[in-house]
Design a protein with these regions (language model features):
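Domain-level marker for long, solvent-exposed, non-transmembrane regions
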Residues: 21-224
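Sec-dependent bacterial lipoprotein signal peptides
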Residues: 1-22
Length: 224
């Protein structure tokens, strides 16, 4: 089952331990109960003698998108990560090669636009912005955004095990696909959409137009 996430991927009780053990066998899931720990058995770089996970993977797993966007390599960009989990390496690699980031971008932008307008409102967003609020959230979720660039993809084979009995474990592959968009590029697309929806929305009062312009000022200085 495909899951795209932009949140912390592992439970706080889990840890990553890079080991030199490589497995060519199909992982055999076993029942786990209670607290579990996690270790990396193998990853994309293992065959090339690369022991450490890429910084972007390690950062994303540990701190999510917010941590990833603080790395010097991605300052000035918005980051989007797609993830697939499965028990077959070929299957997750195929997923990574065909991953379409557009839906992830649209969902993220819509969520951030919703939060931006809600946070800037003095009361109910519907009261401050009228029908415009609903229109802009819908439009941002359905829009197609340009400028996304694939940076890298990486798979890891993870073993989740019972610390009291390592024989009780499950193995799974996780693949991550990283895309970025320059903040200036995406912000301008969203600002253009804000103006377009405002022009199309009927019955917007002067007070609501002022509230919308205030949100634009916040976005121009801070981004989405």
């Amino acid at each position: 089952m495909t899951r795209i996430k932009t949140i912390l991927l592992l439970a706080v009780t889990s840890i990553f331990i890079i080991t030199s053990c490589a497995s060519n066998k199909e992982p055999e899931p076993q029942e786990l109960e209670g607290s579990v720990k996690t270790e990396v058995l193998e990853h994309k770089g293992t065959a090339l003698g690369i022991n450490e996970l890429p910084v972007w993977v390690d950062t994303y797993v540990s701190t999510g998108i917010s941590g990833l966007e603080k790395l010097s390599d991605y300052q000035g960009s918005y980051c989007f990560v797609g993830e697939e989990i499965g028990t077959n390496l070929d299957a997750v690699q195929t997923w990574a090669s065909t991953f379409d980031v557009s839906r992830e971008i649209a969902a993220t932008v819509s969520s951030r636009v919703d939060s931006l307008f809600t946070g800037a409102s003095s009361g109910s967003p519907d009261g401050d912005y009228g029908t415009y609020f609903e229109n802009i959230v819908k439009a941002s979720a359905n829009a197609t955004y340009s400028g996304a660039r694939k940076i890298n993809d990486w798979w890891i084979l993870i073993r989740r095990y019972d610390p009291d009995s390592r024989k009780k474990h499950t193995d799974e592959y996780r693949v991550f696909v990283l895309y970025t968009i320059e903040k200036e590029t995406l912000d301008q697309q969203v600002l253009n959409m804000i103006d377009a929806i405002a022009a199309e929305t009927e019955g917007t009062s002067d007070a609501q137009k002022t509230a919308i312009n205030n949100v634009k000022k916040i976005m121009e200085s801070e981004g989405i």
